[in-house]
Amino acid sequence: MSMTDPIADMLTRIRNASMAKLQKVDIPSSNLKVSLANVLKAEGFIKNFKVIADNKQGVLRVYLRFIDEKEPVIREIKRVSKPGSRVYVGSDEIPSVKSGMGVAILSTSKGILTDKVAREAGVGGEVICTVW
């Protein structure tokens, strides 16, 4: 079975695992998913991640972060740009998530960036997801 939106699958696995209070979740790996996990780690939404090699595409293991071991740090993680409805923004149109409390993650010409970094760099791109 082919997957039409692997990024949405990754975000859904992270959302479900955090709601179920799991410490880690395994996701089929790709370069884009590793870049996305890198941004989530830098912003403090996940503890860590590692890529485990197998004979296929590899597995991305994401270690989730919780507040007092009970409440997940990720309250909401939502896909914005979808395969059937892409959302592109210019550097002056980058959305603010929850009045700056959350993060929008963009795919730009300079790589996967947060909304703040993209504004500072003056680049726009495709809005992958929002996290808060």
UniProtKB/Swiss-Prot annotation:
Return the InterPro entries for the record.
Ribosomal_uS8 (IPR000630), Ribosomal_uS8_CS (IPR047863), Ribosomal_uS8_sf (IPR035987)
Superkingdom of origin organism: Bacteria
Q: Does the keyword rRNA-binding apply?
A: yes
Provide the GO MF annotations for this entry: rRNA binding; structural constituent of ribosome
Taken from the UniProt entry, a GO cellular component term is:
ribosome
State the Gene Ontology BP annotations: translation
Which key words are in the record? Ribonucleoprotein, Ribosomal protein, RNA-binding, rRNA-binding
- Family, similarity comment: Belongs to the universal ribosomal protein uS8 family.
Q: What does this protein do?
A: One of the primary rRNA binding proteins, it binds directly to 16S rRNA central domain where it helps coordinate assembly of the platform of the 30S subunit.
Quaternary structure annotation from Swiss-Prot or TrEMBL:
Part of the 30S ribosomal subunit. Contacts proteins S5 and S12.
Protein's UniProt name: Small ribosomal subunit protein uS8
Q: What organism is recorded for this protein?
A: Geobacter metallireducens (strain ATCC 53774 / DSM 7210 / GS-15)
Q: What is the lineage of its organism?
A: Bacteria, Pseudomonadati, Thermodesulfobacteriota, Desulfuromonadia, Geobacterales
Q: What gene does the UniProt entry assign to this protein?
A: rpsH
